[in-house]
Design a protein with these regions (language model features):
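A short, aliphatic-rich alpha-helical micro-motif
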Residues: 1-2, 179
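Nucleotide-sugar donor phosphate/pyrophosphate-binding loop at the beta->alpha transition
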Residues: 1, 9, 32-37, 119-133
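Short active-site oxyanion
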Residues: 2-6, 228
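Short, surface-exposed amphipathic charged segments that create phosphate/polyanion-binding patches used
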Residues: 2, 40-49, 164-167, 245-246
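Donor nucleotide-sugar binding/catalytic pocket of nucleotide-sugar-dependent glycosyltransferases
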Residues: 5-15, 23-37, 47, 52-58
Length: 283
């Protein structure tokens, strides 16, 4: 809370949270991407219908559940189920009341003989990872039953028998080729990102790739769904849009190109740094 410091958050909801908590230097600033950095990378042999690049988020949730009563476990499952229905919002913190945390920690302390407990923030993030992991698994399972899906990650999941696990790809050397070669690049945001535009979305666009993403409120401040980005509302809508865009190549290419132009125009590092310096000069 030092007044000399400025902290920039790409998620407006987080910036507002810290401002309300007395961090006067908290500011909102959307992320940036540099298409020039990716321009020299040649398109490789990464062709597929749908590509997903990222973690599968295998959380510590299942391990934690071993120390919980059936009641506590059921309550946390209810929180995960409720969060899974929310697109573009985060309700886990609101549902993790002080009474809930006391109940959970009572179970943990009993199971560990007084040696283990969790903070509200630790439990919230664990539930967020579990929720996102389940969403990503469900999406990949549903899509791999219908089309060719490549997963680029250090993580694997034996349940996804029809998906192709392609391992890690380097951010600068291989990632741009993946985004350009894949017909559809799928983004499923970590649900703790409440309003902001994830870097993955901007990177895909900066590479000239087509992105299908869950809805993020700040995305709508810059992009128009169906013109320079594709947005799904839920799993059913995601499947429908994947099938639609796989059948409409020219539209897919036009949206990808429009997204690329928008990133070039509105998400430059120079503009972000200029804004940061202007904020610093206010004092």
């Amino acid at each position: 809370k030092n007044k000399c410091n400025y902290i920039f958050f790409f998620d407006r909801a987080q910036a507002d949270y810290y401002l309300a908590d007395g961090v006067t230097g908290a500011r909102h600033l959307a992320l940036a991407a540099d298409p020039d950095v990716f321009a020299g990378v040649k398109t490789g042999t990464y062709d597929c219908d749908v590509a997903f690049l990222g973690q599968l988020y295998k959380s510590e949730y299942q391990d934690l559940c071993r120390g919980l009563s059936l009641y506590s476990r059921g309550y946390l499952e209810g929180i995960i189920a409720a969060q899974s229905q929310i697109n573009g919002g985060y309700i886990i913190d609101e549902m993790l009341t002080a009474d809930t945390l006391r109940l959970v920690n009572s179970d943990f302390l009993k199971a560990s003989k007084g040696r283990f407990s969790v903070t509200g923030r630790e439990l919230s993030y664990t539930l967020a990872k579990e929720t996102t992991g389940r969403q990503r698994y469900t999406a990949l399972a549903l899509l791999s039953d219908r089309c060719n899906v490549n997963v680029y990650s250090n993580d694997t999941d034996g349940r996804l028998e029809k998906a192709s696990f392609c391992g890690y790809v380097d951010y600068y050397d291989k990632m741009p080729a993946v985004f350009r070669s894949s017909k559809i690049n799928l983004n499923i945001s970590l649900c703790t990102i409440q309003t902001g535009i994830p870097l993955r979305v901007l990177d895909i666009m900066a590479c000239g790739g087509f992105v299908l993403t869950n809805m993020q409120p700040e995305l709508m401040e810059y992009f128009i769904p169906g013109e320079d980005v594709a947005v799904y509302e839920d799993m059913k809508d995601m499947i429908a849009k994947v099938q639609f865009y796989l059948e409409h190549e020219e539209l897919r290419k036009r949206i990808a190109h429009n997204g690329y132009l928008k990133v070039c125009e509105m998400f430059r590092f120079d503009d972000r740094i200029k804004y940061m310096l202007e904020i610093a000069d206010e004092k």
